[in-house]
Amino acid sequence: LYNTIPRCVMDGGTGRSSALVFSGVDDEEFRLLKNDDTNPERRFVRNMSNNSICADTPEDYAKIAKILPPLIKEAGEPGVFNRFLARCGMSRHADPRLKRVRGTNACSEVLLEGWEFCNLASAILQRCMNPDGTIDYNKLRNACMLAAFYTAIVACNPLNEARAEAVRAENLRVAVSLDASFVGYETLSNQEFGTLLKSCKELIITYVDAYTMAIAGKKSVTHTCFKPGGKIPPLADSLSSINGPICSQYVELRRII
C-alpha cells in the first residue's frame, strides 16, 4: 500500500508520500525495527515509514530520554512524539479539543485525532523576497492570507467518510506553515525575526478564524506551525497537504496548488 501511494501523488514532478508509525514506551521490538543487526531482513523496507515512540506522561518521556540516544545514533530512529505536551497546548487557555489528540501527520507538525484529516498549506518565505534579497512583506502577507483562505475552505468541506466527517465538523483543523523560515533568521536580527514570526502567526489566526466562522460558524482548533527548512516547489508559492488516516496510522499526501 505505502509503495503504491507515491505513484499517485506528484510534488514538483516527483512522486512523494510519507508515513509515521507510533508505538508505546515499552515496545522493545518496535524500538529495534530499524537496527540492521537485529532485523537485517528489514533493510530494504525499513524506510517505508518514520517510527516514533509516544510519551503520554512526564515519566514516559524521562524513560525514553535514557533509552533512545544510542538507538538514534545507530539508526537515526525512532523519534519521540510527546503526546502529553501536545494535549496540554501552549498556553493556560489551550483549546480543550486538544485533549483528544491521538497522533500527528507524518512530519508531526499537525496534531490529529483518530480518523482526522490533516489540512496543511505552506507559505514559502523564500518565495516572498525582493530582487535585492530583502523580504517582500506585502507578498508574504498575501501568501499567508491565501493559504489561510484555501485551508479554511478545505476544512469546511464535507467528507465522504462518516468517522472522518464527525471529527472534521468538530475541529475544523487548519494548519498554515511558514516554510523556509531560515531565510528570516539569516536576513533579519533575532528581534526582527521574532517579530516577523509573531506577526505571521497573528495574521494567520485572524484570517483562519474569520473564514471558518463565516463558513461554518466555528473557530479552528489549530492554526500555525513554522519550519526552519522546507522544500521549495518550482511551480507555486504554497503546498497543500492532506493526510488520510488508515486505522491508527497516518499517510501524508502532498501536492502543489
Label each residue range with its predicted role.
Residues T4, T14-R16, S49, A62-L68, ...:
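Short, well-ordered loop/turn elements at secondary-structure boundaries
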Residues L1-C8, D56-L71, P78, M145, ...:
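Alpha/propeptide regions of enzymes that mature by internal proteolysis
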Residues P40, N47-N50, T57-C88, R92:
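Charged (Asp/Glu and Lys/Arg) segments that form or flank catalytic channels of large polymer-
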Residues L1, S238-I257:
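Catalytic or ion-translocation cores adjacent to nucleophile or general acid/base/metal-coordination motifs
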Residues L71-L188, R254-I256:
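Function-dense linear segments that define catalytic or interfacial modules
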Residues E109-F117, A143, A166-S177, L196-Y207, ...:
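Secondary-structure capping and boundary motifs in well-ordered enzyme cores
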Residues G13-E59, A155-A162, A180-G229:
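Internal maturation/activation junctions in enzymes
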Residues Y2-E29, P69-I72, G76-G79, F84-L85:
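Structural signature of the thiamine diphosphate
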